[in-house]
A protein has these predicted regions:
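Active-site recognition of the HExxH zinc-binding catalytic motif
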Residues: 134-137, 192, 236, 240-255
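Short, surface-exposed helix-loop/turn micro-motifs enriched in polar/charged residues
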Residues: 128, 256-257
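Surface-exposed patches in mature extracellular/periplasmic domains of secreted proteins
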Residues: 143-154, 253-256
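Auxiliary tRNA-acceptor-end handling modules of aminoacyl-tRNA synthetases
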Residues: 1-121, 139, 156-209, 213-230, ...
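Zn2+-dependent metallopeptidase catalytic core
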Residues: 120-148
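Conserved nucleotide-sugar donor-binding subdomain of glycosyltransferases
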Residues: 233
Length: 257
């Protein structure tokens, strides 16, 4: 009876329910009690969404290409036999000028991939975040798309905009002690179409950027031999970390080794 629904939001294609679960936490370490009935609150968000009305053409995953996939299991008339197919997870980009695209020329997509940048970010962070997102346009040009991805501020005069609506992919500011930039995306399990993505940048991201740059470059870069991270180095690191997570949000797997 201590848990309750905090908010319910309804949109055109999804609903979001925020719930606060309250517990009395008891914990032990090495059989020794370390906490007894400590009041604890855990916030959980549930989202239910309709799948797109139009179905994107599936593409079977090629193991030679680092693309995320969703598993699809099918059964034939022999109920004891099943087949697993891995469907590539990707954004549904459609060229505006199909004729030019087929001739190998660049074309803008009908609907570009758009990430909205949280208003809660410090102003001096935003340009690095925008650069980290739009850096991927160079890669999309190799696939024939011009200005395929963009980063915009939260709309100020659009009363229909809500960051909890899956119609909008957002880069969110997280006021926590965490240091690592993370991401997630939502894909249609039937087709693999990515329909929403989120990138989360914590307030203490600068601590991780400092450690990475100090360990990797302090021996040759005198500006890193200090306890204070220079703003230009912070921007460089933030751009890299955002670009990395946006890449994952595009359905790309880590290129490790």
């Amino acid at each position: 009876e201590m848990s309750y629904v905090r908010t319910i939001k309804s949109f055109d294609r999804n609903i979001t329910i925020n719930v606060d679960f309250n517990y009395l936490l008891t914990a032990s370490l090495l059989s020794l009690p370390v906490a007894s009935e400590i009041p604890t609150t855990v916030g959980v968000t549930y989202s239910l969404a309709l799948l797109p009305d139009s179905k994107m053409r599936q593409r079977v995953t090629d193991s030679r290409v680092g693309i995320a996939s969703v598993s699809k299991l099918t059964f034939d008339n022999n109920i004891a036999k099943s087949k697993q197919t891995l469907i590539a997870q990707r954004w549904n980009l459609i060229p505006q000028n199909l004729k030019a695209y087929e001739q190998g020329k660049l074309s803008k997509p009908v609907k570009p991939i758009c990430f909205y940048i949280d208003d809660a970010f410090p102003v001096e962070w935003k340009n690095a975040i925008k650069q980290g997102v739009e850096l991927w346009n160079k890669a999309f040009e190799q696939a024939g798309y011009q200005k395929a991805i963009e980063a915009l501020d939260f709309p100020k005069n659009d009363h229909n905009f809500d960051a909890d609506d899956i119609a909008y992919s957002c880069i969110r500011y997280v006021p926590s002690t965490a240091e690592k930039v993370t991401s997630s995306f939502l894909a249609n399990p039937q087709t693999g179409e990515i329909i929403n993505a989120s990138v989360f940048v914590p307030a203490n991201v600068g601590d991780q950027i400092y450690r990475w740059l100090f360990l990797g470059s302090a021996a040759s870069d005198a500006t890193m031999r200090t306890s204070h991270l220079p703003q230009d180095k912070f921007n460089q690191g933030l751009k890299y970390m955002v670009a990395c997570e946006v890449g994952r949000s595009l359905g790309l797997l880590d290129n490790i080794g």
